[in-house]
A protein has these predicted regions:
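Surface-exposed extracellular loop regions of Gram-negative outer-membrane beta-barrel proteins
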Residues: 1-26
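Beta-sheet repeat architectures centered on beta-propellers
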Residues: 26-183
Length: 183
């Protein structure tokens, strides 16, 4: 896949004399930044200017319950900092982006492509690498640290949890585990 600011092309090996053949896949399609697309399982996912897309033989908009939430709190002057990552252990595509009040990436939105649900949160990250080279996903931050993801224990408290599917959004402010003790 080759992205421009308004179109997507497919580039395939065709052999000599041309070596590669280029065909247009879709016109009138945007991509938020050069790093906002990722490929997994024969699909390419990306964040456009106001939509999320997947290419799986054809370009399709991904229904997103958090679309307005993400794009209404977005710093367009820092759009080139948007990047995508894959967490293949959980069938997730992560997009990291700067919120309206930030000049650095401080928010994320996740799409679980197996369950077709969305989640979001706040996290300062500048790069992401899925497991493969390492046992776990690893990311970088503006504090000059590398972080292992999907490891360790909780920090003793819960974060707000939200999930969306099609036109329904679920917000759970806190999760409180409890035990039933009986004699």
């Amino acid at each position: 896949m080759v992205f421009t600011d308004t179109s997507i092309y497919s580039m395939q090996f065709v052999g000599p004399p041309d070596t590669f053949g280029i065909t247009i896949v879709s016109e009138g399609i945007s991509i938020r930044s050069p790093n906002s697309a990722v490929a997994i399982e024969d699909n390419v996912f990306w964040m456009g200017n106001n939509e999320f897309y997947v290419y799986n033989g054809a370009v399709q908009k991904i229904p997103c319950t958090l679309r307005d939430f993400v794009f209404s709190d977005f710093n367009n002057l820092q759009a080139e900092k948007v990047f995508a990552g894959v967490n293949s252990s959980f069938s997730e595509i992560w997009w990291f982006y700067p919120s309206a009040d930030s000049n650095e990436v401080d928010k994320y939105v996740i799409y679980n492509y197996q369950q077709q649900i969305w989640y979001y949160g706040s996290l300062n990250r500048t790069a992401w690498l899925d497991r493969g080279v390492n046992e776990l996903p690893i990311s970088a931050s503006t504090d000059f640290y590398l972080y292992n993801h999907e490891t360790g224990d909780d920090d003793g408290s819960t974060n707000p949890v939200s999930a969306g599917r099609n036109c329904h959004i679920l917000l759970i402010p806190y999760l409180l585990p409890y035990a039933v003790i009986s004699s």
